Amino acid sequence: MLLLWFGFFSFVCGLVIYRLQFHPLSKFPGPKLAALTSLYEFYYNVVLGGRYLWEIERMHEQYGPIVRITPHELHVADPNFYTEIYAGPTRRRDKDPRLVRLAGQPTSMFATVDHGLHSSRRAILNNYFSKRSIAGLEDMIQGKVQKLVKRLNIACDQGTVVQLDAASSALTADIISEYAHGVSLDYLDDVNFNNEVADSILSLASVVHVLKFFPFLLDLSKFIPDKVLENLWSHAANILRLQKLVRAQADVALQNGGKVNGQATMFGALCDPSLPAQERTLDRLQDEGFSLIGGGTETTTGTLKVIMFHLLNEKALLRKLRKELEESPSGTWAELEKLPYMRGVMNEGLRLSGVITRLPRRAPDEALRYKQWTIPPNSLMSTSSHFVHTNSDLFPDPLVFDPERWIRAEAAGQRLEHMIVTFSKGSRQCMGNHLALAELYLVISTLVREFDMDLYGVTADNIVTHREYGFGVPKERGGGLRVSISRVRTP
């Protein structure tokens, strides 16, 4: 026993000496405890609950723009270095395998570690999500928006309170499922907008940091019978049911040349016979199909939630946007993008929402230079959109929702829109950015034109980011964006 304790003590001492003196990142600034052990991150993200991002912010205030935040990871809080970390397709950037496995869809594009394999998988779907292709979807998107309008008109007649973020989640889920899978989920038909699915995604996100440190829990959950899992954790069971539905649709597509109900789908591209056999399996189609629903609903809804809260919380902003919309001859996506104040509202919403977690990358083929520092090849490095979007040099009073900052920047010749990184940048930029923007422009303009709304028991604590669970989570999570609603009175 004494020998075992001596061996353990020797191992710990050796590890401490290596990480502080001989590790490739040992010369970079940062807290010694963070360099020694990931328990530093564990404390802030697991014990305190999603608070490490703000501890990293404090580190940068103390140590400067580049900091060693874990034994194996550097964090850079310089907006000008963002495109070095998240570089274009000609420069290889691999993901961290320990992080992407948390997605639970191991063969999806999002979970693909290798740069080359990701590029080939992305190329298959690029055309489906190009701006031109999404513009061709406008009639379908408008149809779903009008379906939402009908539901909201019923709420006006009945005097019921609407949970606007649940309605948005239903809308975006119906759009992406019909476009990608050929069959709409029809969440807009559900009396509660199928709110349990959105709630389940948020509930699972709340344990993402636990799973990062104990990834075997994710593997174990796959062996728990559905009935048992439903009793233990209904949110996980809801996600499993949706996965099974996507799998069934993918199976139909595989058996019918990529078509579902006779309609061409994204699955058709994924099971093209020219692809290698391992790239057109049922598991692969399920993973990609489910990943699109997960990625295409809650992030878009989060932006809508931020925008509508600020418009309703400060009605002068709402009145200014409504006036601009009333003076616009058209409500098409292309025309809405040209409206200066509307564009400012959208940019502020994107700036104050979205995925804010660190997205680590490795540059296996090159050493990167940042000021006097050389980042060794294959080192984990990251930043967060939070540090770009709240940079006071770029965005004075960064926590203030100020649509006119974009109008002022344009008048001054500043290309401030290039600093919006909500969808990330580079070769792994979110593929669904054009779809998300089309949805947001069309639904927000419709809501502002047609309805008067008032916040119902909602404060900034229900909206403003306080914790990081992948995306930003507010201090008070219950209830969502609840509003009382009535039709706009025409003069």
UniProtKB/Swiss-Prot annotation:
Its UniProt pathway annotation is: Secondary metabolite biosynthesis; terpenoid biosynthesis
According to its UniProt entry, this protein's organism is Penicillium rubens (strain ATCC 28089 / DSM 1075 / NRRL 1951 / Wisconsin 54-1255)
EC nos: 1.-.-.-
Topological relation to the membrane, as annotated: Single-pass membrane protein
GO cellular component assignments: membrane
Gene3D superfamilies cross-referenced by the UniProt entry: Cytochrome P450 (1.10.630.10)
Q: Tell me which residues bind heme.
A: C430
Please describe what this protein does. Answer: Cytochrome P450 monooxygenase; part of the gene cluster that mediates the biosynthesis of conidiogenone, a diterpene known to induce the conidiation. The bifunctional terpene synthase PrDS converts isopentenyl diphosphate (IPP) and dimethylallyl diphosphate (DMAPP) into deoxyconidiogenol. The C-terminal prenyltransferase (PT) domain of PrDS catalyzes formation of GGPP, whereas the N-terminal terpene cyclase (TC) domain catalyzes the cyclization of GGPP into deoxyconidiogenol. The cytochrome P450 monooxygenase PrP450 then catalyzes two rounds of oxidation to furnish conidiogenone.
Q: Which biological processes are named by the entry's GO terms?
A: conidiogenone biosynthetic process
One of the Pfam families matching this protein, by short name: p450
Keywords of this protein's UniProt record, alphabetized? Heme, Iron, Membrane, Metal-binding, Monooxygenase, Oxidoreductase, Transmembrane, Transmembrane helix
Regarding protein family, the annotation reads:
Belongs to the cytochrome P450 family.
Task: Write the protein's name.
Answer: Conidiogenone synthase PchP450
**Subcellular location(s) of the protein:** Membrane
Spans traversing the lipid bilayer: 2-22
Q: Which GO terms describe its molecular function?
A: heme binding; iron ion binding; monooxygenase activity; oxidoreductase activity, acting on paired donors, with incorporation or reduction of molecular oxygen
Q: What is its main location?
A: membrane
User: Known PANTHER family for this protein?
Assistant: CYTOCHROME P450, N-ACETYLTRYPTOPHAN 6-HYDROXYLASE IVOC-RELATED
The broad enzyme category this protein falls into is oxidoreductase
Cofactor(s) this protein cannot do without: heme
